[in-house]
From Swiss-Prot:
GO terms for molecular function: ATP binding; ATP hydrolysis activity; DNA replication origin binding; helicase activity; zinc ion binding. Isoform large T antigen is a key early protein essential for both driving viral replication and inducing cellular transformation. Plays a role in viral genome replication by driving entry of quiescent cells into the cell cycle and by autoregulating the synthesis of viral early mRNA. Displays highly oncogenic activities by corrupting the host cellular checkpoint mechanisms that guard cell division and the transcription, replication, and repair of DNA. Participates in the modulation of cellular gene expression preceeding viral DNA replication. The J domain is essential for multiple viral activities, including virion assembly, viral DNA replication, transformation and transcriptional activation. Forms homohexamers in the presence of ATP. Interacts with host HDAC1. Interacts (via LXCXE domain) with host RB1; the interaction induces the aberrant dissociation of RB1-E2F1 complex thereby disrupting RB1's activity. Interacts (via LXCXE domain) with host pRB-related proteins RBL1 and RBL2. Interacts (via C-terminus) with host TOP1 and POLA1 allowing DNA replication. Interacts with host preinitiation complex components TBP, TFIIA and TFIID to regulate transcription initiation. The modification N-acetylmethionine is found at residue 1. This is Large T antigen. It is found in: Host nucleus.
C-alpha cells in the first residue's frame, strides 16, 4: 500500500482526511473519514472546491492501486503438503523457512505473482525473532487456549518489535489468535490449557506459545492490508466484520435522531412554500438545532438585519427569524447558512407575514423567545400612512365621448381640459349657446374628474381609448342594425338639435328650404328618392349623379344630404396609388360623396381635365355594391365591407358608358342667378352655412312630407316639430320667402 502513493501524496491524503498517521492502512476508518470530508468539502455544501478535487484524486488513485495489487495476488502451497503440520490458512516460505497466513484463497499462482512475492519477502528482516512480552493473569479462567482450527488471518509484520504497543491494555477475550513464527521455520508447540511454566524462583515465566496479539487500531490496519481479497466487496465486508468484533465491549450508540422535513404546522400559514421561485424576500426564518441557531444568529449579521431573534421549541430545536433592509432569494440565504451546518439539519423559508408570525410565537406556550436584537415587532412598523390618491375615472370619460359621439381624441381632450375650469367663471356655461351644448350640459358632471385629468400623465392614452370605444360601438351598431334603423337614429338626433333652436334660427333654416324649392320645384320628391336609394341600397341602383355647370348648387345640396344621413366627402382626383387610404375613410359610413370629379373635357375647353372619372371607372366593384371590398386606413387593419352608396358631383365632363350605367338617378343642374343674388342679400345664410346644414334638409322633410312617411319611433317628435313650424310660419309666409328669392332679394325681407 505504501508503494501506491508517494510520501507527499500519503501525507496530503492523511491531512485531508484529518486522520492520525498511525491509522494509515485502516481502510474502513479511512473510507468513513473520506465520506465525512466529502460532506464538508463539497462545493454545494459551501466547501472548498480545490481541496475536494485533490481529495477525490488521491482517494481514486489509492483505490485503483489497491485493485491492481489484488490482481497480482496468488496462492503459494507447501511443497510437502501431505506431510505438512501447519494449520489451515498457513503457507511455507521456502526462502526464509517460515510460514505466513493468507485469506484470499484464489486458485492458481502465476510465475509473475511468485516473483512479486519473492521480492516482497526478501525485504523482511527474519534474523530477529518476533516476540511479545506480556504478563498473564493469575486466574486460570482468564487464559485462553490455542484453538486447533483458528480462522485464517494475515500476519502483522512490524519493522520494530520494540515499538509495538504491547504494553497497552487490550481486551483479553479476543477470538483471534496468532502463532509466533520462528526464524528456523518451525512453529512453537502449543501449550495446553491447564499447563503453565514457572521460573526457578517460583515466579511465572512469559508464555511463548499461543498468545493474544493486541489489536490496536494501528495493528488492525496493518492486518487488514496484509491480506488481499478478490474483490472490493470482500474487503469492505471483512473490514466491517473486523471492526464489529473489536468493539463488542463498547456501549451501543443511541438510534439516530430523525431530522424534521418541514416547519411546525402552527407556523406554516405565515411562510412561503414556493420551491422553484426566484422571487426575492426581506424576511426569513431558519429552523435548526438550538446550538446551530445560536451560531447562525451571529453569522446572519452579514445581511445587516433590522430585526433578528431566536425562538426555542422543545428545548432542543430553535428558529432564527430575521428581516433585512434589502431583498434576497431564499436559496442564497439557505446556501450561506448551510456552510455552518455540516451535520445538523437546516430548513429555510421566506416569511410572508412576519408580524403575525412573531405574535403567534409570543403567545404560544410551545415557544420561548431566547434573544432579540431589539424588543419585538410592532404593528406601526409595518403600516405606512399613505394618503388615498384619487385617480381619474377612465370609464366616466369614455361615457362622455360615447354620449356625444366624439370619435376624435383631440376633441375629447379639449373638452375635458375646459371642464377642469371653475364652472362659475366659465363663459360657455354662462352663454349657454345651442352649439355649445356639449360643454355646458356636461361641465358640472365632469368637473371633478376633469381636475384629475388635468394632472394626469396619460391624457392622450385615455382620450384615445375613449375614441376607440366610440368607434367600436359604432361599428357594432352598423353590423347589427338595418339601414332604416340607422337613418331613423340619425334623424332623431337632428330633431333634438332642432328643438333647441330659437324661432329666429328656425326662420333662417326655413328660408334655406325655400331656396332649394326655387332650385327644384319638386325638391321634396327629389330628396325622398335619394333617401330611398340610400336606405334600400340595391346593387347598381343606389348611386346618384349631380351634373351641371359651375355655381349651379351641386356641392351645396350634396353636402346637405351627406350631413343629413351621416356621410363623408372623398376626393378621387388623386393618383391611383393614393386611392386606397382615401377610400378607407368610408369605413362604417352611411353614404359618401365624390366631390367635383374631373375627367376628359371633350368640347368644353374651359374645363380642366383630371383623373377622377378614370379612377371611378376603375372602381366599378366599389360603385356596384354587389361584393365586399377591402378598405384600409393608416395604422388600421383592412376591413371588408360593402362600399356605401354615393353621390357624384361633376361638371360637364365626358362620362364613359361603363361608368354612366352605375348611376340610377342623374340630376342636371342649371345656373340660376337669382339664387346667388338672394344669398348675397342675406349674409347670415352664408356665414352659418344654412344651405349645407342637415337641419335645412330635416325642416324640408318636416315641411313637405306627411307624418306617416316617418319611422314610428319618430312620429311623436315629428308631430311636435311640425306644429311648432306651422305656428311660427304659415304657407303664406313661406310663399313670400320663395317670391323674395326669385326676385333675388333677401328671403326674409319684410317678414
Amino acid at each position: 500500500m505504501d508503494r501506491i502513493l508517494t510520501k507527499e501524496e500519503k501525507q496530503a491524503l492523511i491531512s485531508l482526511l484529518d486522520l492520525e498517521p498511525q491509522y494509515w492502512g485502516d481502510y474502513g476508518r479511512m473510507q468513513k473519514c473520506y465520506k465525512k470530508k466529502c460532506l464538508q468539502l463539497h462545493p454545494d455544501k459551501g466547501g472548498n472546491e480545490e481541496l475536494m478535487q485533490q481529495l477525490n484524486t488521491l482517494w481514486t488513485k489509492l483505490k485503483d492501486g489497491l485493485y491492481r495489487v489484488r490482481l497480482l495476488l496468488g496462492p503459494s502451497q507447501d511443497p510437502n503438503a501431505s506431510t505438512s503440520t501447519s494449520r489451515p490458512g498457513e503457507f511455507y516460505n521456502p526462502d526464509t523457512g517460515g510460514y505466513w497466513s493468507y485469506s484470499y484463497g484464489s486458485a492458481g499462482y502465476s510465475d509473475q505473482q511468485k516473483k512479486y512475492w519473492e521480492e516482497f519477502f526478501s525485504k523482511w528482516d527474519v534474523n530477529e525473532d518476533l516476540t511479545c512480552q506480556e504478563e498473564l493473569s493469575s486466574s486460570e479462567d482468564e487464559f485462553t487456549p490455542w484453538h486447533p482450527n483458528p480462522p485464517p488471518s494475515p500476519v502483522s509484520i512490524s519493522s520494530d518489535s520494540s515499538s509495538s504497543s504491547c504494553d497497552e491494555e487490550y481486551p483479553r477475550n479476543s477470538s483471534r489468535k496468532r502463532k509466533r513464527v520462528h526464524a528456523n521455520g518451525s512453529p512453537n508447540t502449543p501449550i495446553q490449557p491447564n499447563k503453565r511454566a514457572h521460573t526457578p524462583g517460583g515466579g511465572r515465566t512469559t508464555i511463548r506459545g499461543d498468545t493474544d496479539i493486541p489489536r490496536t487500531p494501528a495493528r488492525e490496519s496493518q492486518s487488514t492490508f496484509g491480506s488481499y481479497f478478490n474483490s472490493t466487496e470482500e474487503l469492505e465486508e471483512e473490514i466491517s466484520q473486523t471492526q464489529q468484533s473489536h468493539h463488542n465491549t463498547t456501549p451501543k450508540k443511541p438510534p439516530p435522531t430523525v431530522s424534521p422535513d418541514d416547519f411546525p404546522t402552527i407556523l406554516r400559514g405565515f411562510l412561503s412554500h414556493a420551491i422553484f421561485s426566484n422571487k426575492t424576500q426581506n424576511a426569513f426564518i431558519i429552523y435548526s438545532t438550538k446550538e446551530k441557531c445560536e451560531v447562525l444568529y451571529e453569522q446572519i449579521d452579514k445581511y445587516n438585519p433590522d430585526y433578528k431573534g431566536i425562538f426555542i421549541m422543545k428545548q432542543t430545536e430553535a428558529f432564527v427569524m430575521f428581516m433585512t433592509p434589502g431583498k434576497h432569494r431564499v436559496a442564497a440565504v439557505k446556501s450561506y447558512c448551510c456552510k455552518f451546518c455540516t451535520v445538523s439539519f437546516l430548513l429555510c423559508k421566506a416569511v410572508t407575514k412576519p408580524l403575525e408570525l412573531y405574535n403567534c410565537v409570543a403567545k404560544c406556550d410551545d415557544f420561548q423567545i431566547l434573544k432579540e436584537n431589539k424588543p419585538g415587532l410592532y404593528h406601526f412598523e409595518f403600516c405606512d400612512e399613505k394618503k388615498e390618491v384619487k385617480q381619474i375615472d377612465w370609464n366616466f370619460l369614455t361615457s362622455f365621448a360615447v354620449e356625444n359621439e366624439l370619435d376624435d381624441p383631440l376633441v375629447i381632450m379639449g373638452h375635458y381640459l375646459e371642464f377642469s375650469q371653475c364652472e362659475s367663471s366659465c363663459k360657455k356655461c354662462a352663454e349657454a349657446l345651442p352649439r355649445m351644448k356639449v360643454h355646458w350640459a356636461n361641465h358640472s358632471q365632469h368637473l371633478e374628474n376633469a381636475e384629475l385629468f388635468l394632472h394626469c400623465k396619460q391624457q392622450k392614452s385615455i382620450c384615445q381609448q375613449a375614441a376607440d370605444n366610440v368607434l367600436a360601438r359604432r361599428r357594432l351598431k352598423v353590423l347589427e342594425s338595418t339601414r332604416q334603423e340607422l337613418l331613423a337614429e340619425r334623424l332623431n338626433k337632428l330633431l333634438d338639435q332642432l328643438k333647441d333652436l330659437s324661432p329666429v334660427d328656425k326662420h333662417l333654416y326655413l328660408a334655406g328650404v325655400a331656396w332649394y324649392q326655387c332650385m327644384f320645384p319638386d325638391f321634396e320628391m327629389m330628396l325622398l328618392d335619394i333617401l330611398k336609394l340610400f336606405t334600400e341600397n340595391v346593387p347598381k341602383k343606389r348611386n346618384v349623379l349631380f351634373r351641371g355647370p359651375v355655381n349651379s348648387g351641386k356641392t351645396s345640396l350634396a353636402a346637405a344630404i351627406m350631413n343629413l344621413v351621416g356621410g363623408v366627402a372623398l376626393n378621387v382626383n388623386c393618383p391611383a396609388d393614393k386611392l386606397n387610404f382615401e377610400l378607407g375613410v368610408a369605413i362604417d359610413k352611411f353614404a359618401v360623396v365624390f366631390e367635383d370629379v374631373k375627367g376628359q373635357t371633350g368640347d368644353k375647353r374651359h374645363l380642366q381635365s383630371g383623373l377622377g372619372i378614370n379612377n371611378l371607372d376603375n372602381l366599378r366593384d366599389y360603385l356596384d355594391g354587389s361584393v365586399k371590398v377591402n378598405l384600409e386606413k393608416k395604422h388600421v387593419n383592412k376591413r371588408s365591407q360593402i362600399f356605401p352608396p354615393c353621390i357624384v358631383t361633376a361638371n360637364e365632363y365626358f362620362f364613359p358608358q361603363t361608368l354612366y350605367a352605375r348611376f340610377h338617378k342623374v340630376y342636371n343642374f342649371e345656373v340660376k342667378d337669382f339664387l346667388a343674388k338672394s344669398l348675397e342679400e342675406n349674409s347670415y345664410m352664408g356665414r352659418h352655412r344654412v344651405c349645407q346644414s342637415p337641419l335645412t334638409m330635416l325642416i324640408a322633410l318636416l315641411w313637405n312630407v306627411p307624418t306617416e312617411n316617418f319611422d314610428k319611433s319618430l312620429k311623436e317628435k315629428v308631430e311636435t316639430e311640425k306644429k311648432v313650424l306651422s305656428d311660427m310660419c304659415n304657407f303664406t309666409t313661406f310663399a313670400e320667402m320663395c317670391l323674395n328669392i326669385q326676385r333675388g332679394a333677401d328671403p326674409l325681407e319684410a317678414l
